[in-house]
Regions:
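Short, surface-exposed loop or secondary-structure junction motifs
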Residues: 1-220
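Short, small/polar residue-rich loop motifs at catalytic or cofactor-binding pockets
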Residues: 230-232
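Hydrophobic beta-strand positions
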Residues: 69, 237-238
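Extracellular/periplasmic catalytic domains that process cell-envelope and extracellular macromolecules
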Residues: 200-201, 238-240
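Short, hydrophobic/aromatic-rich segments at coil-to-beta transitions
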Residues: 220-226
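Short, well-ordered beta-strand elements
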Residues: 236-237, 243-252
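Residue-level detector of beta-strand structural context in well-folded domains
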Residues: 206, 224, 234-236
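Generic C-terminus detector
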Residues: 251-273
C-alpha cells in the first residue's frame, strides 16, 4: 500500500481520477460488458499516482494489481490459482469470487445504517469494482475485495498462517512468504501516514497490519499480532505469542474497525488471564 495506486476517492486528485476509471467501468458493466482484471488494472495504471512509490502509506488497489501479477506468472486465472493452491488444500469449500445458486439461501445481504431512520438498509450501489453482488462469476477477480467466504473458512486460512504456512503437516506457503505477510515493512516516515484508528500502534506487512506498540493500540494485544478489517466488518487477527486466532464478521458498510470486534477481543484476552 505504498505504491501510490489508490482506490476511488473524491477527497484528493489521484482518487478523483480513479473514481472516473471505476465509474466508467460500472457504466460499461451495466450495459453488458465483461471487463477483465487485466483491462481494469491497465486503465487504473493510466491514472496519476497519489505520491511517488515508497513515499507514504495509503490504502489502494495494490492487492488487485497483485492478483493480475499472479495470473501473469502462473498462467492461470486468479480464481483458479487460489482454488488449487489454497482453498482446496485448506478445505475452504465456501470461499469463491461468487456464490453458486445452491448456496444463495445462506448468502447475507450487504447493509448500510440509515442514521435518519435508525435502521439497516440493503446497499443499493456498487463499490470497489464489485458488481452483481457476488451472484455470478465475475470477469474482474478482485484481490482486494472480491472473495465471499464464511467464518469457518476464514479461520482455516488464519490457522494455516499462525502455524507458519503449514496445514495438517503440508506446507502451503513458504516460510519467507509467511514472513512477508506477517512482518512490518514500513519505515518510520511511512508509518506516520498509517493513521486509521484501528491501526494505531501498528505497522504494515503485505496486506496485514502488524502490532508494534501495544500501548498505543485500541484494546489489547501482543507485539507481532497481525490481521485486518474488511470494509463490511470482517475482522481477523492472529496472535503468534499466545497462539490465538480471532474471527468476527458482520455485513455493514463501514463496519471495519468496529467497536464490537475490539470489545470481543478485550473480553477474550481478559478471560484467558
Amino acid at each position: 500500500m505504498t505504491s501510490g495506486l489508490v482506490y476511488p476517492d473524491m477527497s484528493y486528485p489521484a482518487g478523483i481520477k480513479m473514481e472516473e476509471v471505476y465509474h466508467k467501468y460500472y457504466e460499461e458493466c451495466e450495459a453488458g460488458a465483461r471487463i477483465s482484471t487485466r483491462e481494469l488494472m491497465e486503465r487504473a495504471a493510466r491514472s496519476p499516482l497519489a505520491f511517488q512509490p515508497g513515499e507514504k502509506w495509503l490504502y489502494g488497489i495494490g492487492a488487485d494489481v497483485a492478483g493480475l501479477l499472479i495470473e501473469e506468472l502462473s498462467g492461470r486465472s486468479f480464481r483458479e490459482f487460489l482454488k488449487k493452491e489454497l482453498f482446496e488444500p485448506l478445505g475452504m469449500t465456501d470461499t469463491d469470487f461468487y456464490v453458486p445458486k445452491e448456496k444463495l439461501d445462506r448468502f447475507s445481504e450487504m447493509y448500510l445504517w440509515n442514521d435518519n431512520e435508525n435502521r439497516l438498509e440493503v446497499i443499493p450501489w456498487q463499490h470497489l469494482g464489485l458488481r452483481g453482488f457476488f451472484k455470478e462469476p465475475p470477469a474482474f477477480e478482485s484481490g482486494g475485495a472480491g472473495l465471499v467466504s464464511t467464518a469457518d473458512d476464514y479461520a482455516k486460512f488464519a490457522s494455516m498462517l499462525i502455524h507458519g504456512g503449514v496445514h495438517n503437516g503440508t506446507r502451503l506457503l513458504s516460510e519467507n512468504a509467511v514472513k512477508i505477510m506477517t512482518t512490518d515493512h514500513l519505515t518510520f516516515e511511512q508509518r506516520k501516514t498509517l493513521d486509521w484508528d484501528q491501526c494505531r500502534g501498528c505497522g504494515y506487512s503485505c496486506l496485514n497490519r502488524v502490532l508494534t506498540a501495544p500501548s498505543e493500540c485500541e484494546g489489547v494485544g501482543n507485539i507481532g499480532e497481525y490481521g485486518w478489517d474488511g470494509w463490511l466488518g470482517t475482522y481477523y487477527c492472529n496472535d503468534p505469542v499466545d497462539k490465538i486466532t480471532l474471527i468476527y464478521m458482520i455485513q455493514r458498510c463501514g463496519g471495519f474497525g468496529s467497536y464490537p470486534s475490539r470489545q470481543m477481543k478485550k473480553i477474550i484476552y481478559e478471560a484467558l488471564k
